[in-house]
A protein has these predicted regions:
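Formylglycine-dependent sulfatase
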Residues: 2-385, 390-446
């Protein structure tokens, strides 16, 4: 039996089915799926402030990403993958599989209030299934360490966009609680990469989950080790270097003979930053919005999955995916059990990774601060009751008149409003911030 056929037929119970309902049953767990006699490694690569307009396999006009493109050619590229448009809230959904009105991580500051006694993150789901886990890189706005949320090994730095020790927050970093000095001429992305390689080399005989949160391409944009003295485009240099590191990781997995048993997922934490969005064009067109907005340019992300012998090569998938979906997907892939004491909003897309139809989402949900929307393949409805025609997305979002007589628009409003009513974000944890998603109300900040 071929490996892909064995994996597909060995499933018992679909752990990744959406469980968006209260299941307050202590710490009981849902059964997972035993996918293989040798559990696959999971490598999750999270780029910072990278939108689809900066990845060449998505049609970017001004940037080339050959190694990321190679991942797409050898796997599946998703065209409708969404996440909250700022890094802290985005990472909260990625690691918990829960929407922001449930966790309270509705703005950057409030993300830091998440507690391991309340929220179960990905490592504590995978470890009982036999996985060793690591978080290497940016650790969002969380004041607690990755170890507090279950990671066995971690490297973290303070702030965002750390590259050289000339930066105010670039002097030191932490490895498993021990402070390390970033020395002169050491490049933080290279330091992180070496820790990635050391981790996978040390644990190559045991299934591992790697949460690799890159510095690139968050500001402050500085020259890379490969930038020439006369370089006029440090931003493009940074995208190129990020892509180079992805290629080096793939090469190392090949060298260690781990590629055939490793699921690689490449994703972005939010869209392109405002100052860079004008150049992040596709076919000469700028995306609507940018990082921090409630438009496509803020939340539509590159999502590429690659798993030799399992994920079919060169496939493009148009199903809706959002960032809560990684938790149930990785649990299903790992044969792990999902928590039953919390509502989990994610839908597993493991079937799509296998190249099968599966049961795709009908819509995704995105929130930032007190703003939210549901979006399906053609329409979007926000918290203000505004309906948008998304037929020209991601470049244009056309507001539909409230009194429209268009039967399709009327049906879409009814359908999406029912989805919002079922989720009831207004009944969840209220945002206490300044309305932008960037800061909590300073009077209420813990």
């Amino acid at each position: 039996m071929k490996r892909r056929e064995f994996i597909r037929t060995a499933g018992v119970i679909a752990a990744g089915t959406a469980v968006a309902r209260d299941l307050v049953l202590g710490r009981d767990l849902l059964p997972g799926i035993l996918l293989s006699d040798k559990k696959p490694n999971i490598v999750f690569i999270l780029a910072d402030d990278l939108g689809i307009g900066e990845v060449s396999c998505y049609g970017a006009d001004n940037y080339m990403t050959p190694h990321i493109d190679q991942l797409a050619r050898g796997g599946t590229r998703f065209t409708h993958a969404y996440t909250p448009s700022l890094c802290g809230p985005s990472r909260a959904t990625i690691l918990t599989g829960r929407y922001l009105f449930r966790t309270g991580a509705t703005n950057q500051d409030s993300t830091g209030r998440m507690k391991p006694s309340v929220e179960t993150m990905m490592p504590n789901i995978l470890k009982p299934a036999g996985y060793i886990t690591a978080a290497i890189g940016k650790w969002g706005q969380l004041p607690l360490d990755p170890a507090d949320f279950g990671f066995d090994y971690y490297l973290k730095f303070t702030g965002s966009g750390i590259y050289w020790n000339t930066q105010a927050k670039g002097k030191t970093y932490l490895v498993n609680g021990e402070e390390k000095v970033l020395h002169d001429k050491e490049y933080m992305p290279d330091v992180m990469h070496q820790h990635v390689i050391d981790f996978i080399t040390k644990h190559r005989d045991k299934p591992f989950y790697l949460y690799y949160s890159m510095s690139h391409v968050h500001t402050e944009i500085l020259p890379t080790p490969d930038s020439t003295p006369d370089s006029k485009d440090n931003y493009a240099d940074n995208i190129t270097y990020m892509d180079k590191l992805v290629g080096k990781l793939i090469a190392e997995l090949d060298r260690l003979k781990l590629r055939e048993n490793t699921l690689i997922v490449f994703f972005g934490d939010n869209g392109t930053a405002n100052g860079k969005a004008d150049r992040a064009t596709i076919g000469g067109r700028r995306l609507a919005g940018a990082k921090g907005s409630m438009l496509e340019g803020g939340s539509l992300e590159p999502l590429i999955v690659n798993w030799p012998g399992v994920a079919p090569a060169g496939k493009v998938n148009h199903d809706m995916v959002d960032s809560t979906d990684f938790v149930p997907t990785f649990a299903e892939v790992a044969g792990a059990k999902l928590p039953r004491n919390k509502v989990l909003d994610g839908h597993s897309f493991t079937a799509q990774i296998h190249g099968e139809k599966g049961k795709p989402r009908e819509h995704i949900f995105i929130q930032l601060a007190g703003m939210w929307y549901v979006r399906d393949a053609a329409w979007k409805l926000n918290q203000a009751g505004e309906l948008f025609d998304m037929s020209n997305a991601p470049f244009e979002e056309k507001l539909v008149a409230a009194d429209t007589k268009d039967p399709a628009a009327i049906a879409a409003r009814k359908r999406l409003q029912a989805a919002l009513d079922q989720l009831n974000p207004a009944g969840g944890i209220k945002d206490d911030g300044d309305g932008t998603g960037r800061h909590a109300n300073r009077k209420n900040k813990e």
